[in-house]
Amino acid sequence: LDAGSEAIIVKTDVSKKDSINEMVEKAIQTFGKIDILINNAGIRHVKKLLDHTKQDWDDMISVNLTAPFLASQAVIPHMIKNGKGKIINFGSIASFMGRPDRVGYVAAKSGVLGLTRALSVDLTGKNINVNTICPGLISTPFNQKYAEDPKHGEAWGKETVVGRWGQPKDIVGAAVFLSSDESDFINGSEIKIDGGWLSSKVRKGELDNE
């Protein structure tokens, strides 16, 4: 915005197709085209497996998986008309592993990887790239209660190779890159931004410098 760009806010219920379509049409009316779509809405219920209701499950799938599909479906015709486009879905480290008390979230975020791959194939020849960013422990309002938890917060951060929780700024570079022409040969892929958390489960005393 400091560079003179224009932004609008469109209140949208991403669980509803009509609301998503209205958001897209408002963007087209305002800017004339859509070059980039970032599917980053997300919710998470943390409950024991047997306490996880069907409504909890439906909520997880609707917002975390169905919404990226519907938004992509709404935007893709405009990108085809433009002759190019970039779609960035947001997965999670939960896309690659089970996590306790998060059955719906893990299932939905795993599905995002499949959605990304399928979309990239279906859009062959359309000059539209579809990729996924998979954040790890990022200190945002979404994870605030875990990051600030005196028992687990600092300990979880130290389990990353980098040795800390990530910050929102750690995500920005990947999003900008995947939105740019420099990523034109990357399609149907995912970038993990987790401080090495998935690569090596470091425990205190295991490193040579400790």
Language-model features: locations:
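Alpha-helical segment proximal to the catalytic Tyr-Lys
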Residues: 77, 121-125, 184
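Substrate-binding pocket helix/loop in short-chain dehydrogenase/reductase
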Residues: 48-49, 56-61, 156
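Active-site helix of classical SDR
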Residues: 72, 108, 116
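Residue(s) in the substrate-gating loop at a strand-loop-helix junction
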Residues: 92
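Short C-terminal tail/terminal secondary-structure segment
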Residues: 97, 176, 187-210
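Short-chain dehydrogenase/reductase
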Residues: 1-31, 45, 55-56
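Active-site loop-to-helix junction immediately N-terminal to the catalytic Tyr of the SDR YXXXK motif
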Residues: 47, 52, 98-107, 118
